[in-house]
A protein has these predicted regions:
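Nucleic-acid endo/exonuclease domains
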Residues: 1-141
Length: 141
C-alpha cells in the first residue's frame, strides 16, 4: 500500500512504506530539501546491467539515504556492495527499521553488516543521528 506525504514545497509524494513515510517526516521536520526516488544509479552485476533507485536524495549535501525494513538476502546485500564499489565517492547511508535485526539468511545484524561494509547507518528511531547527518558540512561539489 502506498503512503502519502508532503515534501517541503507542499507537493504530495507517494512513498512505499511506513518507514519511508517516517523518514520523509523527519527530513521535512528538519527543513532539509529532499527528493524521493529521483536518483537512479546504473550498476553492473558481472555480465548484466541493473538500475537501483535511491529512496531519498539530499542534493545540497550529496547524501543518499536508503530506508530498509529488512535486508532480505545475499543478493540484495550484494547490490549495495556493488553500488559502493562502482560509485566510490557516493555517500549512501541506511536508515533501518531495526539495526539489530538479523539479515535474511545470515547470522549478523543489519548494523553489523553496514559497519563491515563501511556504510553509515542508524535506526528510524535515531532522529538525532539523522539530524547530525544533515548538519554535516557538505563534501559534495
Amino acid at each position: 500500500m502506498k503512503h502519502v506525504v508532503q515534501d517541503g514545497n507542499g507537493k504530495v509524494i507517494k512513498v512505499r512504506s511506513k518507514l519511508e513515510t517516517d523518514l520523509a517526516y523527519i527530513l521535512s521536520d528538519l527543513k532539509v530539501p529532499w527528493t524521493y526516488e529521483t536518483t537512479k544509479l546504473s550498476y553492473t552485476i558481472p555480465e548484466s546491467l541493473h538500475t537501483y533507485t535511491v529512496d531519498f536524495s539530499i542534493p545540497n549535501k550529496g547524501i543518499l539515504i536508503e530506508g530498509k525494513g529488512y535486508l532480505s538476502d545475499h543478493k540484495e546485500r550484494s547490490k549495495y556492495i556493488l553500488i559502493k564499489e562502482q560509485y566510490p565517492n557516493l555517500d549512501l547511508r541506511f536508515v533501518f527499521m531495526d539495526c539489530n535485526k538479523l539479515c535474511g539468511g545470515a547470522k549478523y545484524s543489519h548494523g553489523t553488516w553496514a559497519t563491515k561494509q563501511g556504510f553509515k547507518y542508524c535506526s528510524i528511531k535515531d532522529y538525532e543521528i539523522i539530524k547530525e547527518w544533515l548538519n554535516e558540512t557538505s563534501n559534495f561539489t
